[in-house]
Design a protein with these regions (language model features):
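Alpha-helical transmembrane segments of multi-pass membrane proteins
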Residues: 22-27, 111-118
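Membrane-interfacial alpha-helical segments at the cytosolic side of multi-pass membrane proteins
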Residues: 77-94, 140-156
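"…centered on the first transmembrane helix and the immediately adjacent amphipathic helix/loop
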Residues: 2-87
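Alpha-helical hydrophobic membrane-insertion segments
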Residues: 4-18, 102-105, 147, 151-159
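Short, charged juxtamembrane terminal tails flanking transmembrane helices
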Residues: 160-168
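Interfacial helix-loop-helix junctions of multi-pass membrane proteins
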Residues: 115-143
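Internal alpha-helical transmembrane segments of multi-pass membrane proteins
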Residues: 95-112
C-alpha cells in the first residue's frame, strides 16, 4: 500500500473515530442528565411529533404510548448506530480477517459495557433510576448494529467480487 493511500486510510479512521467520540459523549451526556430535564425534553419531542402527525390534540394515553415508544426506540437506535460506527472503525483499522474478528469482538465488549454502564450510572443521577430492561434494549441495539454492519459488508463484498469477475 502506498504512503498516500495509508495516509488516506489514517484520515478516514481519524475522522470516524472523532465522530464516534462525539457520538459517545452526546450519548453519555443525554443518558446522565437529570430526570426532570430528560422528561421535559422527551415531552417536547412527543408534543412536536404529535402536532406534526395528527391534526387534533393528543389525549393522555396517546402521549404516554408515544413517549414510551420514543424512549424505547432511542435506546435501541442510538446503540445500533454506535455499534455500526465502531464496526466500521474496526474494519478500517484491522486489515486481516483475524484482526477484524478481534476488532468485532472488542467492539461488542466496548459497546456492551457502554450499554450497561450508561444505565447503571443513572441510579446516581437525581430523578433517574436503573432499569435492566433499558440495558437490554441497549445491548439488543448493539447486536442489531453489528448484524447490520456484517450484512452491509457481505453485500459490499459480493458486489466487489462480482464486479471484479466481470472485468476479467
Amino acid at each position: 500500500m502506498s504512503n498516500a493511500k495509508k495516509f488516506g486510510v489514517f484520515l478516514v479512521v481519524l475522522l470516524c473515530a472523532a465522530c464516534m467520540f462525539v457520538f459517545i459523549y452526546t450519548l453519555v451526556k443525554l443518558s446522565l442528565q437529570e430526570g426532570e430535564s430528560s422528561s421535559r425534553l422527551t415531552q417536547a419531542v412527543v408534543n412536536q411529533i404529535g402536532e406534526a402527525a395528527f391534526d387534533e390534540e393528543l389525549d393522555a394515553n396517546q402521549i404516554h404510548a408515544l413517549n414510551l415508544f420514543l424512549r424505547t426506540m432511542a435506546h435501541f437506535v442510538l446503540f445500533s448506530i454506535l455499534s455500526f460506527g465502531m464496526c466500521t472503525i474496526a474494519f478500517l483499522v484491522f486489515a486481516h480477517p483475524a484482526g477484524r474478528f478481534f476488532g468485532l469482538v472488542l467492539n461488542m465488549l466496548i459497546c456492551a459495557a457502554l450499554a450497561y454502564g450508561t444505565e447503571y450510572f443513572k441510579q446516581f443521577v437525581d430523578g433517574r433510576h436503573f432499569q435492566i430492561e433499558d440495558a437490554w434494549l441497549n445491548i439488543y441495539g448493539v447486536i442489531i448494529g453489528l448484524c447490520s454492519f456484517l450484512i452491509a459488508d457481505l453485500i459490499f463484498w459480493a458486489i466487489r467480487a462480482r464486479s471484479s469477475s466481470q472485468s476479467e
